[in-house]
Amino acid sequence: MIVKKYQMEVAGRPLIVEIGQVAQQANGAALMRYGDTVVLVTATAAKQPREGIDFFPLTVDYEEKQYAVGKIPGGFIKREGRATAQATLSARLIDRPIRPLFPKGFRNEIHVVATILSVEKDNAPDVTAITGASVALSISDIPFAGPVAAVIVGLVDGELIINPTVEQHQKSDLHLAVAGTKEAIMMVEGGANEVPEETMRDAIFFAHEEIKKIVDFQENIIREVGLSKMQVEIPILDEEIKKAVVEFATPLFEEAVKNPDKKTREDQMDSSQKSVLQHFTESYPEEEKLIADVSDETMKAVVRKMALEEGERVDGRKLDEIRKVSCEVGFLPRPHGSGLFTRGQTQVLSVTTLGAISEEQRLDGLGIEEKKRYIHHYNFPPYSTGETKPMRGPGRREIGHGALAERALLAVIPSEEEFPYTIRVVSEVLESNGSSSMGSVCGSTLSLMHAGVPIKAPVSGIAMGLVKEGERFAIMSDIQGIEDALGDMDFKLAGTEKGVTALQMDIKITGVNREIVEAALKQAREGRMFILKKMLEAIDKPNEELSPYAPQMIRMQIDPDKIREVIGPGGKTIHKIVDETGCKIDIEDDGSLFIMATDEEAAKKARFFVESIVAEVEVGKTYMGTVKRIMDFGAFVEIIPGVLGTSGKEGLVHISQLAEERVNKVRDVVDIGDQILVKVTEIDRQGRVNLSRKAVLKSAVKK
């Protein structure tokens, strides 16, 4: 067994690729070491094409292992279960830049597995896995037009940084994952803190310079250990038959696609497709599949030609024209906030729920973030596209779209100090014809403002498309479903008036250059501002008051040493407060205490109980107290009453301090149960409280 090791530096840390030591049964395997982060990436391929499919069967799995960060998995079973949301997002991150680089028409099943074996938090395993996937595929016999590489770009104090450390990431206004080949960008994914479009552009191409170096590094590896690629036999239709199909199908599709209504257009396109097949399969029955493929390509060519040569789209819009936008808030009466966003035939209902801080989501992954208090979920039911499918929970697409919309709003969500609530937004896609994820961004903004969440600025989003033939290209604003399916790029961008908060770019060709990225960013901003203006017509700022159905929140700060008094032995005291008031109470280690109630009176009552428990006796302060015990030398007076079975705070009024004149017997002045005004004169070293009634009487006489 020959083991090969290759090394280069990326962002000042060693990137080591090991070939030949592990996973030798796979078509290709690479053990990637980036600092102390270790990722094994394997690529395997079926020997024969999968029959009866019209798509490329690529599967990418990202396997997080808890031992990689020295953890034992939680739960009863104590082993890793189904993929976490973060693992799903990482798998998608690997899939997107490699998928366009396989041969067109390739139908062999491909399985790429990235297993995370060790994680050093300064060195991200997901982008390391993208480079690892490229190495594994490139050195294997699987046909692949790579290599590709990926890096993360941060922005700290105005300076762009490759692969920022955890400390740098916490200060960064940008977290952008960029993947590409030596020639072009393939994929961009990230979030930002209202960063200008020009800076985003610079970040993308700053990343590309580093990517080129990593690609050069991979090419050296491939030259040394790369295998010969397997022969792929992709059936091709006879040129004469193909020419006849194109000539027959083109006028049918030119008429069918020019219908603004999605359902009518799809019906006409299906009818045209059937006409083509009926016309040719009688003469060439054995070529039916290839004829259908050419017919699909013809339809695609018609749509693309309209955009490139005529500057027109299937629904009659210009390239930069946005579909009709309508916005409504308060669509639902009982939820804490709701917004209905409609753009053309895409419609999203976003609903906001406010909850206690303790309801924030706790994450059991490999990252440094262990909890989050802003949560966005995206649902895409089959009826939204007029289809019938089983509904079995969120798939990879729903998780990815939900995360993108969540990232878009994260930069404007108020801090816990400003707004001590956990916030959950659910976006229900009611109708979809393109860009439902960006519809979720707009709907979320409307819903949050209606709920009274003091977001820093409203956020709008838009999806851009691309048609590219040679050096010619056309960029389309607010793409619909057919333009997404038949175009070369899906470029989603969200942000405020000030700048970008989220960006996602998926390329279906072999990459895009600087000119295209610049043009797309500029045109996207114009579209975003148009949509934002429409949104602000529905609601121009967050409501000042929360919904009457939202929980009332009182925030208190108590001495951390008093936390155990509020909780009580075995939680007895805090449970009594909850039972008595119906409130929910959360206490943090720093003494931050949150009272959440369905009505204001209950919250005030709970606050009174807490204040009574943690109250401290103050020297010099006058209290109305109750005489609890009488001794020969004085009376013990409770000055802070106990609540819910807790002990109150009392002090001693010495017999000499009961009155201005001499007192022979305590009971001559006070008796048990009497309420008297007393002043705290001293708290001695043992914590004993000395009180004086005489001092209060003297003060009253002076007045």
Swiss-Prot record:
Its EC number is 2.7.7.8. It holds the Pfam family RNase_PH. GO terms for molecular function: 3'-5'-RNA exonuclease activity; magnesium ion binding; polyribonucleotide nucleotidyltransferase activity; RNA binding. It is an enzyme of class 2 (transferase). Residues 551-610 form the KH domain. The keyword Aminoacyl-tRNA synthetase does not apply. Residues 620-694 form the S1 motif domain. Its cofactor is Mg(2+). Its main location: cytoplasm. It is found in: Cytoplasm. Keywords: Cytoplasm, Magnesium, Metal-binding, Nucleotidyltransferase, RNA-binding, Transferase. Mg(2+) binds at residues 484, 490. It catalyses: RNA(n+1) + phosphate = RNA(n) + a ribonucleoside 5'-diphosphate. GO terms for cellular component: cytosol. One of its GO terms (biological process) is mRNA catabolic process. Belongs to the polyribonucleotide nucleotidyltransferase family. Involved in mRNA degradation. Catalyzes the phosphorolysis of single-stranded polyribonucleotides processively in the 3'- to 5'-direction. This is Polyribonucleotide nucleotidyltransferase. The gene is pnp.
